């Protein structure tokens, strides 16, 4: 369950940032998780509850934003959002594309007091 490792590191980063600001409490964390990152949002929330105890984030609210998959078609020179996991360009049917978004695992923001 790599969500525990991800959240352990995220809480450590959040705590260090809060301490640098002389904060006494982390009120909220917002994370961006890509749809094809391999991270399960529900498991990440569960991991947060497990690892935040005893830290400045103990009572914080975790908000998870899902980032959809966006591709760029090298043939059409256009971005597109694939309707499923078969990343065929809807305009030209090309399979020559690059993934622009959807793999993110990021701590977007931190709210402290």
Curated annotation (Swiss-Prot):
Pfam families: HypA. Keywords: Metal-binding, Nickel, Zinc. Signal peptide: none annotated. It comes from the Bacteria. One of its GO terms (molecular function) is zinc ion binding. Disulfide bonds: none annotated. Zn(2+) binds at residues 73, 76, 89, 92. Ni(2+) binds at residue 2. The keyword Cytoplasm does not apply. PANTHER family: HYDROGENASE MATURATION FACTOR HYPA. Involved in the maturation of [NiFe] hydrogenases. Required for nickel insertion into the metal center of the hydrogenase. Belongs to the HypA/HybF family. NCBIfam families: hypA. This is Hydrogenase maturation factor HypA. The gene is hypA.
